[in-house]
Amino acid sequence: MRRVTIYTDGACSGNPGPGGYGAILTDDATGKTREIAGGEAETTNNRMELLGVIEALSLLKRPCEVRIFTDSRYVADAMTLGWADKWRANGWMRTKKDPATNPELWERLLSLCEIHKVTFHWVKGHAENPMNNRCDEMAVEKSREYREKG
């Protein structure tokens, strides 16, 4: 099975406000990398964190073993601690009275994780990790582009 490493980051200028995401995919066998970035005019930082992971996984054309590195506790914890699966099983409710946010994005992410063998790893943001820092640069740039269009 092909192994891929993905770094992602999201950014938002205001929360909500214009936002962006950046991701870097690396084929572990060849070292070949691909950068992607995107954004939305009115969004939240958590939506951008999720969308970065979703868009990166969506590029994979066949099932892969994937390691995802993110500085988002929201994404990393929800996936590694099973929260997202629990929210889905409970009809996208975190508790009896508290709905999960971004259910349509979580559904997309969980569906992609059924295709691929995915592990999530949290990394400290704005630290000495060049891949995470590059993703942050792309996310901030996209957020800036949407703010200037605004």
Where are the model-predicted features located?
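RNase H-like nuclease fold core
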Residues: 1-47, 51, 55-64, 136-137, ...
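RNase H catalytic domain
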Residues: 11-18, 54-134, 138, 143-145
